[in-house]
Amino acid sequence: MPKRGETAARILAAAREIVRATGPDSLTFDAVAAKVGVSKQAVLYWYPNKARLIEALVRPALEAESAAGQGAISDKASPPRAIRAFVSALAVFHSSDLDRFRLMYVTPQIGQRPGRNGQMLTTLGRIHPATTEMYDKLAATLVEGGRYDRLVEARRAAAAIHTALLGLILRMAMADALNAPLRARNDGLVEALVDVMAPEAA
């Protein structure tokens, strides 16, 4: 008999494999149960709704992303250097595993919409702190370096910087999925984005 918690780990592994192999639309409790070899009720015991299952899949990746972003920002870094390091580190993090990126930023959008029965809204509330910590560190550096006077403005900028990068990674992920490479190299696009956000001094 599996140890307590082992079934939950097998469920997550199966769900992750389903998403990677056939896409988020295929992630159903029936599909997960069949892959693990347990009943649908056994899956529901550990993850009572799809929002909880998606949260369990996504949250560790978001926390790893946050750690990568925060770790790239060195103490006393100037705002341009901090931005360049932040964007470059997250670009490497995501482009090295586009399936993980899809799991993080595409899967939660599939199926149940935020706020329906309050389930997905609660899930997003649990996930939010990991990304907030990342924004806070970049924002503090931007304020300390004089880029912004107010922390609220710096946080808004941190969110915009991150979102712009995610948009670029989404283009890369789409090109990868369609086997239709973009005209420009991926690293060249990241460099161009970084140069727009934080131009290097002449």
Segments the model singles out, each with a brief description of its role:
Residues S66-G71, D99, L103-Y105, P114-G145, ...:
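Amphipathic alpha-helical packing segments from all-alpha helical-bundle domains
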Residues T7-R16, V32, L57-A61, E65, ...:
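Generic hydrophobic, amphipathic alpha-helix propensity
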Residues A56, Q70-R102, A154-I161:
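Hydrophobic alpha-helical connector segments
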Residues A72, K76, P108-G115, M172-D176:
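Secondary-structure edge/capping motif, primarily at the C-terminal ends of alpha-helices
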Residues F93-S96, A158-A180, D195-A202:
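Amphipathic C-terminal alpha-helical segment
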Residues R10, A14, I18-R52, A56:
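Helix-turn-helix
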Residues M1-E6, K76, M174, A201-A202:
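N-terminal intrinsically disordered/low-complexity leader segments
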